Amino acid sequence: MSAPPERILLFRSGRHLATALAALRAASPGCDITVVATPAAAPALEQNGIDAGHRLLYDRTPFFQPWPFLTSAAGARAWAGRFDRVCVLWNDPDGAGQVNVDHTALVVSPLGFTAITADGSLIVHRTTTIVRREAARAVSSIGIAMLIGLCLFLPARLLRPFRS
């Protein structure tokens, strides 16, 4: 008995949709891909052969935002779909300008998502890695603030007896 095909939810269709679909199909042959898009992207979905059964049209806001998506019909269908993998199509290689889409993907898949770049590269983002990186940044910021405080206030405290 063969395993069922991987069910993939792809956020954000765009000019690189064909590349993203090809990359996903190469990485997971026979996968079942459902695309979440805004109504403005419907022609791109048609052009790439995405049928109505594999589309989730999000029409609550013109851009992806986590809370409105979660409370929309498309969000309910995404949650109910129990997808094996959640992916985000990045137009920029490093994901610049994609934060709302990334956060929306994390709402559906709290453990992480796979980013697909315009050249078809797959980049796995895990929530634990993101949280660890942000915690390290917070700790280093606190450490730097303490060092600056010591450098500024310690000399003033030591020189206090010598002031007139």
Residue ranges and their predicted role:
Residues 5-32, 36-132:
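Active-site and donor-binding regions of nucleotide-sugar-utilizing enzymes
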Residues 116-164:
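Active-site-proximal region of nucleotide-activated glycan assembly enzymes
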